[in-house]
Amino acid sequence: MINDVISPEFDENGRALRRIRSFVRRQGRLTKGQQLALDSYWPVMGVEYQAAPVDLNTLFGREAPIVLEIGFGMGTSLVTMATNNPQQNFLGIEVHSPGVGACLSSAHDAGLSNLRIMCHDAVEVLENMIPEASLDMVQLFFPDPWHKARHNKRRIVQTPFVELVKSKLKVGGVFHMATDWQPYAEHMLEVMSGVSGYLNLSEQNDYVPRPDSRPLTKFELRGQRLGHGVWDLMFERKE
């Protein structure tokens, strides 16, 4: 395991700084199918990281609403959404290679042309590659809740991240989060409510019912049978 939670950054004088990441990069073993997908389909759907803005319309070869998903896991839901919404362009980011391979394989089998995949830290992608006010939706489904209190600072949903997402959304664009850990849902709501320029789309100013746009996962169905909850939050950029 490579600990990527803390990564070095440098100030203007070249002094090393510590940056807390929201994930630990686990180099899981690739199956033969996942490796084949990476070798065969990455050149078609994969996007290499670059520290400069990218033209998203050129990336997809067309102009269409753009949905960015952060941390797509094995890609099952992402591929389903891209299949069900051919009128939209989807950009998925995942740091774990087996998930990237699995997603590429599923996307190829589905014959998708509206999906692009990245294997990199999503914060760096947002900071450096995504143009300002270019995204119609950002999706963050079931991020690591970092249950222990001493690890809460590693949660990706923090004020600087939420501000960063807002800057990349178009006015009217939506930041959609979902979690099955109630303390994290409460944390998300507190952070989002403290940032100006967002409108909570919940009528009760808290959580929204799962929209049809977010597929119901097998894990979620199993949790429902056991009485476990899932909390969706949707906030629109209003300015």
Curated annotation (Swiss-Prot):
The active site is at 144. It catalyses: guanosine(46) in tRNA + S-adenosyl-L-methionine = N(7)-methylguanosine(46) in tRNA + S-adenosyl-L-homocysteine. S-adenosyl-L-methionine binds at residues 69, 94, 121, 144. Keywords: Methyltransferase, S-adenosyl-L-methionine, Transferase, tRNA processing. Pathway: tRNA modification; N(7)-methylguanine-tRNA biosynthesis. One of its GO terms (biological process) is tRNA methylation. Residues 150-155 are annotated as: Interaction with RNA. GO terms for molecular function: tRNA (guanine(46)-N7)-methyltransferase activity. The keyword Manganese does not apply. SUPFAM superfamilies: S-adenosyl-L-methionine-dependent methyltransferases. Substrate binds at residues 148, 180, 217-220. One of its GO terms (cellular component) is tRNA methyltransferase complex. Its EC number is 2.1.1.33. The keyword Ubl conjugation does not apply. Belongs to the class I-like SAM-binding methyltransferase superfamily. TrmB family. Catalyzes the formation of N(7)-methylguanine at position 46 (m7G46) in tRNA. Monomer. This is tRNA (guanine-N(7)-)-methyltransferase. It comes from Yersinia pestis. The lineage of its organism: Bacteria, Pseudomonadati, Pseudomonadota, Gammaproteobacteria, Enterobacterales.
